[in-house]
Amino acid sequence: MGQVNSSFENAVNCCDARSGSRRPSFVKDYNLVAKSLKKEERVTLSAADWEREALEFIAEQGVQALAVEPLARRMGVTKGSFYWHFPGREALLEKALLRWEEHDSRNLNKSLGEIDHPRDRLVSFFRRVPREKLTHEVYSELCAAAGHPQVEPVLERVADRRMQHLSAAFEELGMDPERARNQARLTYSVYLGFLQLQRQNQTPNLSSGAFDDYIEHVITTLIPG
């Protein structure tokens, strides 16, 4: 659409230069429509829409692949719509990562913060995995880009938050603080290992009975009865 608009305008400008005449009314009408469409793009798509689509993009193709032009094409709009909300790609990535982190924090509070019994909290942590597919796919791709300057601090904050919740739950189950921290590390290592195996197609499908069996095995193995 952008190339067509540009070609049309170039042709009109060329005609104007040769004829020295004023632009005909249909050209003015065209310009009004074009401006209206651009304004509609900016109004229709919010910054949140771009952030959500960026997270979907990251989940599918990784952090390094995220770029303005393919993202705009994927959303069926021009890059002008993007620049109405963000000064550049880094700003979008920062906002998208913040959105993901806040979503993860809310989920963590639901699975580990709002349940009274510590064992039930830990069980909920694992059983939420298949219900939060996008969250875990994004996290997997962020781990693959852990050295990225915008990704690294987000991963550190998320890991710290999760480890604190896990350690607290194991302490409430009767473990001393050091053992609880070690058990939390082991539990979180299993989760991270699962994400790596998933990237290599070595895990059951998240919606399969085999995956449910795997989760139950992890729960039985890692969480005291």
Predicted regions and their residues:
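C-terminal peripheral helix-coil segments that are non-catalytic and often amphipathic
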Residues: 2-37, 131, 171, 203-225
